Amino acid sequence: MIDKKILQMHFSRNAKNYDAYAKVQKKMANTLLDMLDLDSKSRLDILDVGCGTGYLTKLLLDRWPDARITAIDIAPGMIEYARDRFNESNVEFACLDIEEAELNQKYDLVISNATFQWFNDLGGTVNKLVQSLKSDGVLAFSTFGHMTFSELHFSYETARRKLKIDEEFPPGQKFCNAKEILKICCETFEGLEGFEFDTVKKESLEYEYFYTVREFLDSVKKIGANNSNKQRKVNTALTKEMIRIYEEMFKVNGLVRATYHCIFITSRKKLAANTRRLVNAVV
């Protein structure tokens, strides 16, 4: 269970560091944008969920300068930092938890980069987002999959078994695999009567390299993405052994590796074929 207060604190206090360290997240934002196929001639209504510093918001504005963009984030520090970067009247920022917020507007595009892993109720949130789409609107998001930080999790479990520690408080966030995420999405889509969805999934692995494990862990903290689970405990002996194993197993040419498993999903909401026939008959 994600503790949202801890999450807010982590991201708020690291807003100024984020863009300097979030190299993978920036690459994901560009990949997600490249997957979109929307009419650039019309004025779009866009919701940017988990906008952070506004990096993706800026990409959206560059592509659709006339779009009306609502950018939201749970962290006040992120919203404050993002607001200072934009002067455009067609971009509005709000500090909101999307899992708690009510969406009273319909959007052509609901987009979210590297945020879905922080939701406690993924299915409920996906349902809320697709309900807010206009007909022919698109939900597009990227998130992290189960192979993310696989080196860290392997080293932690190996150290825990070696030291015979029964308690399980992993050092990093655990992530769903792509099949689980897609299944949740498809079950949600199937529950929306009168609509069908064209869905595309893409996966990739990205790697970062560091001189030490502590440098890697520090880089995660610098973007506020360290563990926000409740009941997080620190065992000094376990941490020390975990780092030793990590550097022994995953250090090549003087550098340790960290894996990011990136998942991208886009889905277009359309009137179902039988609904379209009914609409045409009425017309």
From Swiss-Prot:
The enzyme's E.C. designation: 2.1.1.197
Stored SUPFAM superfamilies: S-adenosyl-L-methionine-dependent methyltransferases (SSF53335)
Gene3D superfamilies per the UniProt record, alphabetical: Vaccinia Virus protein VP39
Broadest EC class assigned to this enzyme: transferase
Keyword set includes Transferase: yes
Stored Pfam families: Methyltransf_25
Catalytic activity, as annotated: malonyl-[ACP] + S-adenosyl-L-methionine = malonyl-[ACP] methyl ester + S-adenosyl-L-homocysteine
InterPro entries: BioC, Methyltransf_25, SAM-dependent_MTases_sf
GO terms for biological process, alphabetical: biotin biosynthetic process; methylation
Function: Converts the free carboxyl group of a malonyl-thioester to its methyl ester by transfer of a methyl group from S-adenosyl-L-methionine (SAM). It allows to synthesize pimeloyl-ACP via the fatty acid synthetic pathway.
Database matches in PANTHER family: TRANS-ACONITATE 2-METHYLTRANSFERASE, TRANS-ACONITATE 2-METHYLTRANSFERASE-RELATED
Matching NCBIfam families: BioC (TIGR02072)
Protein name (Swiss-Prot/TrEMBL): Malonyl-[acyl-carrier protein] O-methyltransferase
Classification lineage: Bacteria, Bacillati, Bacillota, Clostridia, Eubacteriales
